[in-house]
């Protein structure tokens, strides 16, 4: 029930990764990457399905060898979410997975080889209508660019990206997106800002090697939040040294916080103090776990007392304002006659939220695959 995002998205061209639209106003796609051995087909398929379950629009899979390429063929047959093959060093692997129905090829300009090899990949991608991601990384720039700039800079990342954008332009290939990732927030942000002014193609956002679950989430939220608030970005990945499922959750939380794209429940909860009349922290944690399966966008406020409780509840789909023994319950901003027992709020509120989610119009849900 909160206001729509004031962010004006950067205008970009449109590509498709499988059936997922990227750019030109399409919802920002959230993706992750498997961390299993790709040759372990069962483990990789299981992880992809777990990512899809929490909302992943696209999943990237590392394909470091020809054996991994053969495994990719089997994996692709067992999942429905679009797959990006992550290719480094050996361009021939890209040609191989293209035969196996890959939905997008990620190549690293710093190690994929000379222009002739890139031409081979582009020709294959064009023939099979496969988009490419030019994935520049501050830790693996071309040797001549490293020598020129001495250290990763925004200008260095931009030069690497534009070098390969120019190659694709010369080859008359426009089905690509670009990323210029760095582990330093300001370096990444400055690089993306420069790139956004240079090209019209979609941009894939990320703070690479951001760190563990807590610190990496914060670093990613700061960096990507800066860019997204400026309208920059068409797809994103949160790079965490953690379960990839967490990357998807954090990605959606960032988009939800900026009101760019909502999926599931947006909990507004107080940090608690001695005025709380029910256990807010335990209630939030339990409801988050129980309601992970819901995709309907909803705002639910859980405030432990009457100081801010009524005000937050009045601008939420549902809200609780803590009171002695029984707390006030609000729906669509209106206080209801029904009150919730403070010792049983979780069960009561879960039932109300599920019923409300079932009633909300499907027009409020974003199906990224149905965007024209």
UniProtKB/Swiss-Prot annotation:
Its cofactor is [4Fe-4S] cluster. [4Fe-4S] cluster binds at residues 270, 273, 305, 312. Its EC number is 1.17.7.3. Transmembrane segments: none annotated. Pfam families: GcpE (PF04551). Signal peptide: none annotated. The keyword Isomerase does not apply. GO terms for biological process: isopentenyl diphosphate biosynthetic process, methylerythritol 4-phosphate pathway; terpenoid biosynthetic process. InterPro entries: Dihydropteroate_synth-like_sf, IspG_bac, IspG_bac-typ, NO2/SO3_Rdtase_4Fe4S_sf. The keyword RNA-binding does not apply. GO terms for molecular function: 4 iron, 4 sulfur cluster binding; 4-hydroxy-3-methylbut-2-en-1-yl diphosphate synthase activity (ferredoxin); 4-hydroxy-3-methylbut-2-enyl-diphosphate synthase activity (flavodoxin); iron ion binding. Binds 1 [4Fe-4S] cluster. It catalyses: (2E)-4-hydroxy-3-methylbut-2-enyl diphosphate + oxidized [flavodoxin] + H2O + 2 H(+) = 2-C-methyl-D-erythritol 2,4-cyclic diphosphate + reduced [flavodoxin]. Keywords: 4Fe-4S, Iron, Iron-sulfur, Isoprene biosynthesis, Metal-binding, Oxidoreductase. It comes from the Bacteria. Pathway: Isoprenoid biosynthesis; isopentenyl diphosphate biosynthesis via DXP pathway; isopentenyl diphosphate from 1-deoxy-D-xylulose 5-phosphate: step 5/6. HAMAP family: IspG. Belongs to the IspG family. Converts 2C-methyl-D-erythritol 2,4-cyclodiphosphate (ME-2,4cPP) into 1-hydroxy-2-methyl-2-(E)-butenyl 4-diphosphate. This is 4-hydroxy-3-methylbut-2-en-1-yl diphosphate synthase (flavodoxin). It comes from Aliivibrio fischeri (strain MJ11).
């Amino acid at each position: 029930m909160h206001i729509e995002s004031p962010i004006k998205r950067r205008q970009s061209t449109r590509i498709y990764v499988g059936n997922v639209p990227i750019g030109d106003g399409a919802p920002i796609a959230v993706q992750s990457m498997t961390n299993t051995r790709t040759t372990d087909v069962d483990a990789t398929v299981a992880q992809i399905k777990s990512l899809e379950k929490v909302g992943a629009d696209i999943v990237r899979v590392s394909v470091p060898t020809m054996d991994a390429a053969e495994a990719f063929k089997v994996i692709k047959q067992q999942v429905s979410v679009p797959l990006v093959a992550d290719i480094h060093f050996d361009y021939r692997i890209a040609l191989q997975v293209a035969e196996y129905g890959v939905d997008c090829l990620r190549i690293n300009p710093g190690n994929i080889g000379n222009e002739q090899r890139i031409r081979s990949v582009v020709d294959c991608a064009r023939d099979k209508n496969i988009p490419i991601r030019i994935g520049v990384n501050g830790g693996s720039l071309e040797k001549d660019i490293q020598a020129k700039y001495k250290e990763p800079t925004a200008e260095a990342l931009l030069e690497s990206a534009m070098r390969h954008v120019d190659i694709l332009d010369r080859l008359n290939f426009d089905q690509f997106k670009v990323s210029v990732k760095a582990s330093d927030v300001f370096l990444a942000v400055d690089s993306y800002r420069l790139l956004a002014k240079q090209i019209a193609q979609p941009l894939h956002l990320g703070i690479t090697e951001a760190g563990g679950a807590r610190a990496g989430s914060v670093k990613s939220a700061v960096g990507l939040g800066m860019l997204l608030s400026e309208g920059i970005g068409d797809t994103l990945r949160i790079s965490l040294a953690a379960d990839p499922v967490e990357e998807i959750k954090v990605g959606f939380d960032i988009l939800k916080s900026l009101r760019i794209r909502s999926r599931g429940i947006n909990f507004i909860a107080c940090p608690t103090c001695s005025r709380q009349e029910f256990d807010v922290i335990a209630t939030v944690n339990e409801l988050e776990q129980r309601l992970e399966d819901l995709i309907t966008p909803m705002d639910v406020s859980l405030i432990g007392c009457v100081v801010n409780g009524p005000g937050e509840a009045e601008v939420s789909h549902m809200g609780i304002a803590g009171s002695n023994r029984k707390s006030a319950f609000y729906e669509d901003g209106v206080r209801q006659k029904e009150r919730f027992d403070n010792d049983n709020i979780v069960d009561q509120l879960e039932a109300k939220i599920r019923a409300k989610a079932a009633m909300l119009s499907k027009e409020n849900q974003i199906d990224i695959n149905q965007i024209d």
